[in-house]
A protein has these predicted regions:
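Active-site-adjacent betaalpha module
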Residues: 1-8, 34-42, 68-188
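Short hydrophobic beta-strand that contains or immediately precedes a catalytic carboxylate
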Residues: 10-12
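Active-site loop/turn elements of alpha/beta-hydrolase fold enzymes
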Residues: 14, 51-53, 152
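Short acidic, Gly/Ser-rich segments with clustered Asp/Glu that frequently serve as metal-coordination loops
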Residues: 15-20
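…and closely analogous acidic/polar surface helices at protein-protein or active-site interfaces
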Residues: 22-39
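Von Willebrand factor
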Residues: 39-58
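Short, flexible, mixed-charge acidic loops at enzyme active sites
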Residues: 59-66
Length: 188
């Protein structure tokens, strides 16, 4: 069982702008919401990580792949609807950490916040499995966090990529469970 005082649940890119853009991603919201509710009940630290830019996107260089998708469409400016988290995932007052690239630890204070709070275990899930979830797992593992990925609260536009990552790649660096299996394990 995980020590709630040493555990953080990270929701990764469950933002309205991503959910509206990635077809099919809303299918994992019930599982994600169930995981968040469990974490609240267990009093895990909950941190919502997502894209957040300044007005005009000065953080994005012209040559960046983000330029076409984000800057040119004026997406994920902090305080705008596309940067908001889905209502069933985030509550007012819960910690939000913005990033400017793919991984949850990219260009922000997430690592400092986790260490300051004595966090050793990370439980997380995101949209997409091959984007933020993969990047976050790699970095968290390198930073010596013990990780759990909740596979049925992750989504990837390519189901085969999702399957390969959750069945063959992630298990080398994390425990990979369904939300129900994780809850059952923690309640046992």
């Amino acid at each position: 069982k995980l020590d709630p005082a040493r555990t953080a649940l990270l929701t990764l890119d469950f933002q309205k702008g991503i959910l509206g853009f990635v077809s099919g991603a809303e299918a994992v919201i019930p599982n994600a919401a169930k995981a968040v509710e469990f974490a609240r009940r267990k009093q895990y630290q909950i941190i919502h990580v997502g894209l957040g830019f300044s007005t005009g996107h000065p953080e994005i260089p012209e040559h960046s792949p983000f330029n076409r998708r984000v800057k040119q469409n004026n997406l994920f400016v902090k305080g705008t609807p596309s940067a908001e988290f889905h209502d069933s995932i985030a509550r007012p007052g819960e910690l939000v950490v913005f990033k400017q690239r793919v991984g949850a630890f990219s260009e922000n204070q997430l690592h400092l916040i986790l260490r300051a709070r004595g966090i050793e275990h990370l439980v997380f899930f995101g949209i997409s499995t091959s984007g933020i979830t993969l990047s976050t797992l790699r970095r968290a593992f390198d930073l010596d966090f013990r990780c759990v990925v909740l596979k049925d609260a992750c989504f990837d536009a390519d189901p085969e990529v999702h399957r390969i990552l959750t069945e063959k790649v992630f298990p080398a660096q994390a425990k990979v469970l369904t939300v129900d299996a994780f809850i059952a394990e923690q309640e046992a």
